[in-house]
Amino acid sequence: MKRMFWALALAGGLLSQQAWSQQCSLAIEANDQIQFNTKELHVKKSCKEVTLTLKHVGQLAANVMGHNWVLSATSDYQAIAQAGQAAGAPNYLPTGDARILASTNVIGGGQSVSIKFDPAKLTVGGDYTFFCSFPGHFVLMNGKLIVE
């Protein structure tokens, strides 16, 4: 009986650690139809570091149908996207803009990119939007980052 207790306790600990690590590692896909595969991502404020991986599951090149992942306060995302269009290639983001909390480079079909960011910059219950800054994509390619 003791062995069963310890086996269950160990399994429970491993499962809770796996669940915790999954909220510190995020994955999102983008496609040639100007879509992310989710409208909502969740992250734990307690994470020391968050790793986000963007995978472009389409086939078109970055100069035709490039995608990136950008995080900002919801109140800033449209202005950042518009400034990014003016900034142009390769990443369609204004350089050194403090409103950008995290961002990947623009990638093309079949590529993936990962970044790490510090969730200490974020507030539990804050209003955060992720989006693609490739020209015109932010209108369709956006979603919420929920900090728990």
Predicted regions span which residues?
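N-terminal edge beta-strand
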Residues: Q23-E49
